[in-house]
């Protein structure tokens, strides 16, 4: 508890200038995508409206509807993934959504919670929220900063150490809950699997399915 309290009070530095520049870059690219989507659609519409987007894709452009909901055509990520290559507008919409998410959730979201006095982000770390006992983070969720895309990784670079004498280290335990369980239960099969760097899920499946 003491460590988490110290983390929350101390906070983490973020390069506000770099974050603002990144946000402006996203804004510029998002505007380019909006104009290109309008051009490909032949008209302006609310790209963020699934209903309006569905009409454009499946009625005006004649693409085959993959899935329907009670309110109309589904335009979720799975649907767009299946439509890739069918029309150039699909890739533009997918990129638009990715960048809009980065801009609103992370750039704007992080900027909004930078403490005006410390210049840091003071996320709340909670120890008793998750069922498994894993630490959770809110306001903002510092455990959910994007990493899978190149732009997401760029965003991570904006969190900076105290000064040039320090570095930030990113470490992640491998299957920590199952390792603790194996130790507490003294499960010989699990312990052997972990010691031999085996895939514990494959070992479990082989035990269950024979």
Which functions belong to the PLM regions below?
Residues 196-210:
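Generic long, charged, amphipathic alpha-helical segments
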Residues 153, 178-179, 183, 202-203:
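Feature representing long, continuous alpha-helical segments
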Residues 188-194:
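Short, polar/flexible loop-turn hinges at active-site or ligand-entry regions and domain interfaces
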Residues 156-158:
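A generic local secondary-structure boundary/capping motif
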Residues 1-150, 160, 165-167, 174-177, ...:
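Conserved "right-hand" nucleotidyltransferase catalytic core of DNA-directed polymerases
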């Amino acid at each position: 508890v003491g460590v988490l309290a110290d983390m929350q009070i101390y906070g983490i530095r973020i390069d506000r200038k770099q974050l603002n520049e990144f946000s402006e870059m996203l804004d510029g690219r998002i505007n380019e995508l909006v104009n290109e989507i309008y051009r490909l659609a032949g008209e302006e519409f609310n790209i963020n409206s699934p209903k309006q987007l569905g009409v454009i894709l499946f009625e005006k452009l004649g693409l085959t509807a993959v899935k329907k909901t009670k309110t109309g055509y589904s335009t979720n990520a799975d649907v767009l993934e299946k439509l890739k290559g069918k029309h150039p507008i699909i890739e533009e919409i997918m990129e638009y959504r990715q960048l809009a998410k980065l801009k609103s959730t992370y750039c704007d979201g992080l900027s909004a919670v930078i403490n005006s006095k410390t210049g840091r982000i003071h996320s709340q770390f909670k120890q008793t929220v998750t069922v498994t006992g894993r630490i959770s983070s809110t306001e903002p969720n510092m455990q959910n900063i994007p990493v899978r895309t190149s732009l997401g990784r760029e965003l991570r670079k904006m969190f900076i150490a105290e000064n040039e004498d320090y570095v930030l280290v990113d470490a992640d335990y491998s299957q920590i809950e199952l390792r603790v369980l194996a130790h507490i239960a003294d499960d010989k099969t699990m312990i052997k699997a972990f010691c031999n760097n085996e895939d514990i899920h494959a070992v479990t499946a082989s035990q269950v399915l024979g």
